[in-house]
Structure formats: C-alpha cells, structure tokens
C-alpha cells in the first residue's frame, strides 16, 4: 500500500459503509482491474482487447463479475437505468484537495491543461509525492473492485441537501487509499472519461471464451442480450450457473428489447422480390423510435439506444395511461413525431430534438407537441409476442389501439395523441409507388416494407423489414448514417475548428468501423463550432482499436457520434476500407461528393450506423 495520502477523520464512516456491504463470496483487488485497464489503453487491436478481457474475467469471482463488466464500459448499470457516473470537475478538485496533503491546486490545474484529463493529471501529482513518504494518520482499507463499485454507486444515487459534501467525502475516501495508478482510473470512472474501446460484442466474445471455452457460444449470449439489454446480469448468471441458464432469459417488463432493424433496397420492385410478391407497407416517419413499457404501477419510455426518456414525453405517458387502461402489462414500439397544431402537418426530426431537454418540459410540450405512432407489440401480460407473425401482431395492436380521430384530422393532438402507423398490403410496385406518394405528402421519409409471416427478431438486421425512401435524381436513393472516427484541422475560415470529418460504416461481421469518406460540406458555422465542442469529450490519442482506415488524421475519436449524409454515388476507392476487396482486390467503397444533411442521429448507437453490406448493395444497384 502506498501511503501518499492523509485522510480526514470524518471520512472513516464512509469507508466503513463500503466494507460492511462487500459480498463475502470473494473479492477482486482493484489493482488487478487497473493492470487490465492499462493494457487495454495501450492496444489498438480488438483481438488483444478480447484477450486481456478474457484473462480478467477468468480471475474475477462470480460475485464481482457483473460489476467488472459494467466498470470496463465506464458505467454502473445497463444504459436503460439512466444512472450516470459523471461528476462535476469542481467537486472532484475539492475531493483531491482534501485527500492529498499539501496539494498545490495550481500545479494540478497546469498538469490538467497539459494532459486534458484530470485522472492523468492527478496521477502525476500523486506519483511526485511518493518520495516524500507521507504517512496515513488512520488505518486504510483495501481497494477492491467491490468497494470501488459500491462507493461509486452511492455517489451516483446521492441527492438532496448536503449531497455535494457527501459526494466529495466519498470520492476522498477512495483517493485516500489509492495508489497513483488506482487514483487515475478512479477519477476516470467518476468523470466518465474511461475510454478503453470495449464494445458489447467484445464483452460477449470474452465471456463466451472465458466461461464456455468457445467463441461460438457468443450467439447464445447475444440472444439473451437482445431481449434483456443487461450484459452485467448475463455475465453473473453465466459465471454462477452456466450457459444453459442464460438460454432461459426472457423478455421482462422495464428491460428494453434491442430493436429489430431493416435492410435497404433501391426500388419497389426489388423490395417486393425480397418479399416473394406480397408484403405490408407502412409509413416511415421522420421521428424518434421509442419502446413503451406499461405496467400496473408505471409507464417507461426507452429510446432506440435503450436510454430511459420517460421524462421528455410526459404527454405521451399520460396518453398511454388513458388509452390502455384495460391492459395491465404491455410493450409497444412506435415513432414519436413532432406536429404543427395549426396545419396538423408532421415536422422534421430536428424539431423533435427540442423535447430532449432537462428543464422546461412543460414549455417544450406546449411549443413542440407530439403524437405517438404505434407499429408493433412485443409483449402482453407476461407473454412475449415476438414469435407471432407480423400480420398477427398487427391484428393485436389494431384491437388494442382504438383510434378516435377522424380521417381529416389524423394528427389532432387535442383529441388523440396515439394512433397506428398507416399500413396497407401491397402486391405490385405500382401499389407501393401510390402508397409512397401518400406517405411523402403526409411528411414522411418513405415506407417500411415488411414480410407478412416474419417474426420479431430482437437486435437483428435483415430483409424481413426493408426501408424504402423516395428516389432522388442524380443522388443516391437514400441517406446514410455514418460514424465520426477522425478529423482534419480546418484552414482559412475554419481555423480553430475541424475542416473535415472522417466517417465510417459499421462492419457487423467483424464489429469494426471501416472508413468510407471524408465530409467537409453541408456544415454551417454553428455546426462546426458545435462539433468541435461535442467531439472533444470523445477525443483519443490514437486510432481507436475498432476503427479500420488507411487515412491519416490530425485527430482521432471514439466511434460514438452518428451523423446523416447524402452523396452522389458509391465508388471504388484504394484509400477507404469499407467493404475492402468485396468488389475488387485492394479496393474499398467510398462515397462521392458526401454532404452533411444537418442531422445528428442522437437516437442511434454507433452499431446502428449504415452497415458495409448496405454499401455493397447500394454499389451493385448503381451498376444495374
């Protein structure tokens, strides 16, 4: 133990709180987790990340496995719990000043400016004090993963009068007993700055190898994850009871299901061909996809990214409570869309984002009214409905959602905030074209074409669902959602901002983001300023382990932010790695004349971005 700190006496009760609550089923030294963190930071290989994680998981006792899985991803719970680790910088600085004897805030601030990371800065200061042999006035407690987790959990849940002081003391209690290396990662966790490049699929690969000796069992873990969205709980069940217990995990109310996704095609004819000549066509709305969980006592709303967004839409919650009184438990999927009350016209996605505010919810409700358009049902009264065919699920929601509005006022939010997504059965391209015209005139993006006998496969992207947008002359028939992975500094008017962003498509087969274009057009001055600020918190020192590109960038980022672009065509490129060698040896696929549409896809995870398979399909369509 390094005695670099002089703890304050009043911190001891909080230390005791953590120790009393430890699980007696075995502990894991936090230093071992730190060793693994450091190895992961140094690697740029996804395979090496997996190897490091396998070694860690094998040495982790079952009682701590869920905590380790959460912590390596920089969280305490699954995303749907909505519990964040981030703590204000000023509070962390106060905790440091109470924990480190003789701390010079000026020196710390200077180191912080140099490193850009408070954890790195504090580690330098603490290391420098080692040689002074400062001795603790009180016996210190052991730093275990369980203790760190429980303390962070208490910090995240502490609210009300005096909460700031309590949080500072809890942070100090950890820093008092940390080595310089441990303190570095404690602070990274507290401030939400842990960037190890560990994706969900990497964790599942490692769990399968560590506990079943076969990566092929990842598919079982993935199925469980798709219906529960909780990797920590899956890991705990796997470690304690084995793979057979994981197979028994089912859909549960208030645990969001990973959404089923659609493939894309360029023409109505191809869509029908995929559907063997008959299909359902639904309006594709320009809103936010949400999942509604209604139980006896409460209603929760989850975003496409599985984040809890209930507080953003209290009007939708109220409408659901009124409309579905007779149904005790239900999980629905739908699209929330902003509406102009004067014209009853649908408004674009950007207008809906005004509802994503923490304060002034009532004002936002009045200024940006919304309606919910339901298109699927996944669960009713403790029974999953995902194995039913599409047409049977549609019949169910038609019985559940009673539409009381007239045809002339389909979006009259004063009378009815819930409606069914308009749908029709189509048997030829002409019927699709006619319904497409109706959708576009109603303010929609296009159509969703769905196979009548398809089941709902959580987390899957397949041709059972196809998205079809209106065709544009001299441009691709659809926009693309791509992930920002790097940037070049701007020149001239763009000095002090980024001049171009490197964008990547997602390769689901290998869980890698592969570059497909640099985009520098379509941005307003405000866009450039906003991106510079937003991307700063995702900036990393080297190319991310899950990014594949031949391009050299001035700056690299974690693959986190998804933006929408349009382009003239997909072309072969020796410089970009998306779909490398799929069409021609040593050539990937790139976008020609890409342009930012102005839309940041906050509703999408990086893994929801355009897949390289879609790029290949779009390229082949051009050649026909």
Where are the model-predicted features located?
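Beta-rich nucleic-acid/ligand-interaction surfaces
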Residues: 427-434, 454-458, 465, 540-558
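Short beta-turn/strand-loop junction motif enriched in small, turn-promoting residues
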Residues: 192, 359, 454, 471, ...
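Detector for conserved single-position "signature" residues within domains
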Residues: 437-444
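C-terminal structured "cap/appendage" subdomains that terminate the fold
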Residues: 535-592
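N-terminal nucleic-acid-engaging modules of covalent nucleotidyltransferase systems
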Residues: 2-428, 501-504, 508-518, 547-551, ...
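Flexible, glycine/threonine-enriched loop-and-boundary segments that flank and lead into catalytic domains
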Residues: 260-281, 285, 429-435, 451-491
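A short-motif feature that recognizes glycine-rich, charge-decorated loops
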Residues: 310-311, 512-548, 557
């Amino acid at each position: 133990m390094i005695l670099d700190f002089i703890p304050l006496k009043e911190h001891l009760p909080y230390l005791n709180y953590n120790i009393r609550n430890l699980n007696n089923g075995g502990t894991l030294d936090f230093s071992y987790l730190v060793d693994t963190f450091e190895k992961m930071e140094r690697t740029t290989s996804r395979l090496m990340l997996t190897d490091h994680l396998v070694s860690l998981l094998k040495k982790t006792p079952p009682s701590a496995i869920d905590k380790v899985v959460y912590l390596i991803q920089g969280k305490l719970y699954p995303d749907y719990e909505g519990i964040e680790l981030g703590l204000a910088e000023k509070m962390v600085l106060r905790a440091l000043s109470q924990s480190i004897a003789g701390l010079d805030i000026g020196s710390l601030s200077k180191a912080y400016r140099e490193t850009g990371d408070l954890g790195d800065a504090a580690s330098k200061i603490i290391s420098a004090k080692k040689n002074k042999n400062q001795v603790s006035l009180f016996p210190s407690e052991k730093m275990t993963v369980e203790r760190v987790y429980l303390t962070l959990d208490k910090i995240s849940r502490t609210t009300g009068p005096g909460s700031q002081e309590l949080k500072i003391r809890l942070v100090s209690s950890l820093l008092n007993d940390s080595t310089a290396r441990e303190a570095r990662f404690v602070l990274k966790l507290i401030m939400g700055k842990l960037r190890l490049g560990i994706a969900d699929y990497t964790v599942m690969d490692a769990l399968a190898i560590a506990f079943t000796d076969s990566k092929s069992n990842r598919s079982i873990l993935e199925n469980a994850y798709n219906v529960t969205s909780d990797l920590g709980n899956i890991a705990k069940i796997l470690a304690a009871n084995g793979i057979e217990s994981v197979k028994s995990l089912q859909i549960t109310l208030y645990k969001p299901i990973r959404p089923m996704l659609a493939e894309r095609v360029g023409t109505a004819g191809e869509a029908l061909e995929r559907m063997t000549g008959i299909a359902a066509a639904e309006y594709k709305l320009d809103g936010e996809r949400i999942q509604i969980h209604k139980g006896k006592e409460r209603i929760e709303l989850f975003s496409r990214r599985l984040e809890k967004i209930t507080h953003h839409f209290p009007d939708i919650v109220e409408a659901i409570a009124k409309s579905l009184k007779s149904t005790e438990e239900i999980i629905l999927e739908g699209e929330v869309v902003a509406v102009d009350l004067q014209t009853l016209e649908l408004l674009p996605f950007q207008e809906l984002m005004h509802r994503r505010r923490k304060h002034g919810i009532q004002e936002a409700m009045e200024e940006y009214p919304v309606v919910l358009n339901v298109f699927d049902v996944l669960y009713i009264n403790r029974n999953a409905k995902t194995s039913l065919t599409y047409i049977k699920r549609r019949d169910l929601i038609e019985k559940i959602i009673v539409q009381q509005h007239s045809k002339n006022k389909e979006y009259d939010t004063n009378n009815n905030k819930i409606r069914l997504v308009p749908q029709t059965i189509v048997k030829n391209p002409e019927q699709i074209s006619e319904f497409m015209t109706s959708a576009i005139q109603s303010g929609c993006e296009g159509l969703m074409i769905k196979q009548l006998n398809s089941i709902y496969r959580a987390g899957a992207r397949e041709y059972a669902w196809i998205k079809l947008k209106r065709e544009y002359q001299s441009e691709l028939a659809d926009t693309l959602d791509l992930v920002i992975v790097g940037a070049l500094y701007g020149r001239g008017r763009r000095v002090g901002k980024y001049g171009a962003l490197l964008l990547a498509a997602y390769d689901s087969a290998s869980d890698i983001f592969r570059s497909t274009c640099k985009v520098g057009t379509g941005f307003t001055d405000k866009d450039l300023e906003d991106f510079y600020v937003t991307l700063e918190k995702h900036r990393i020192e080297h190319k991310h382990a899950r990014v594949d590109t031949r391009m050299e960038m001035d700056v690299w980022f974690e693959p986190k932010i998804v933006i929408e672009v349009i382009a003239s065509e997909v072309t072969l490129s020796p410089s970009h790695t998306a779909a490398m060698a799929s069409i021609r040896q040593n050539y990937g696929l790139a976008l020609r004349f890409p342009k930012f549409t102005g839309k940041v896809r906050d509703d999408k995870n990086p893994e929801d971005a355009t897949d390289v398979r879609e790029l290949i399909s779009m390229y082949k369509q051009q050649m026909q």
